[in-house]
């Protein structure tokens, strides 16, 4: 589907009479939202900077095809754990997602909870005291009270940001092309999350995280068209998930956080399924810390060279700066 961005009518590159060899029809992008800016469309040199996008790139692949494209082009998707918190940018806030998107991150793992009165929001902990100015349990608090809280960053600094509704984040993802990995918390259900995704029309911007075959089956039952991550290290695991109703074309194979399993990744790829792995975890123990201990992070390139497609990390900014594979994914496959 071609995105309309303030040029009427909007020609294709081949239809644009002003386009000549070495030129493309482009629009500038808002650095915060990733959306084309109105009244910036025009014919320019094909070496236009990275803050513009051609019409052909505006066509977003359906999410399963997008993952296939990244795998086939040996690209990498970097998933920012809890949305990519940074100084002044707390975890699980829309402003943090926008900040990380402007830094080139395109996949965001975020946590979905539900308030006492049934509003879904981004929040990791059961209690409010660590990441907000509030106290008590999320499940015991109405949305009107949650909405007034301020978010606190990892340095315990209060910000002007508030807990975001899931619906608002879904709409932002749909507009920007971002991909959300939704981690369901016990206060809500896959059924409720899937319903919100459908209502927002954001199915091509969402993966649901499962932690067991039962959860994978529950996701498939809630909406068989949604993509998900589920534990799989080859054909046997994939077949077992298929027997539970999981569509392999909607599957990303999660392979853990303890150590890279190159053989498992090769088996998943042989089945046409993208492997995922995490270097995140407890500070001092996670692979992120081990890989950066010598300052160069070369181990991340080893992951790419062995076929990894989706990397969940607590260091998305450093990894994105060190690798070219995420740039390759955007260049070849869009978003």
Language-model segments: residues:
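Phosphate-group recognition and catalysis centered on beta-loop-alpha active-site segments
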Residues: 7-335
